[in-house]
């Protein structure tokens, strides 16, 4: 179980503006949870809910 959610890892959960679910997929907003990208990365803002700042963001690869 993800300590911050009610779902099992890999399962589905709902998320608000800031994502606390690290191992779950957000279904209510149809976006995945990921680290925030550096300024200038448009991809991350479109497909993710930020859960924390990071210089390495898989959404932007």
From Swiss-Prot:
Binding site for a divalent metal cation 3: 15, 19, 24, 29
Sites of N-acetylmethionine modification: 1
One Pfam family, short name: Metallothio
Protein's job: Metallothioneins have a high content of cysteine residues that bind various heavy metals; these proteins are transcriptionally regulated by both heavy metals and glucocorticoids.
Family: Belongs to the metallothionein superfamily. Type 1 family.
Region (Beta): 1-29
Stretch list, region Alpha: 30-61
Residues reported in the UniProt entry to bind a divalent metal cation 5: 34, 36-37, 50
Domain notes: Class I metallothioneins contain 2 metal-binding domains: four divalent ions are chelated within cluster A of the alpha domain and are coordinated via cysteinyl thiolate bridges to 11 cysteine ligands. Cluster B, the corresponding region within the beta domain, can ligate three divalent ions to 9 cysteines.
One GO BP annotation of this record: intracellular zinc ion homeostasis
Origin superkingdom: Eukaryota
GO cellular component: cytoplasm; nucleus
Chain sites annotated for binding a divalent metal cation 7: 50, 57, 59-60
Residues reported in the UniProt entry to bind a divalent metal cation 4: 33-34, 44, 48
Keyword tags: Acetylation, Metal-binding, Metal-thiolate cluster, Phosphoprotein
Binding site for a divalent metal cation 1: 5, 7, 21, 24
Residues where Phosphoserine is found: 58
Name used for this protein in its record: Metallothionein-2A
Organism: Sus scrofa (Pig)
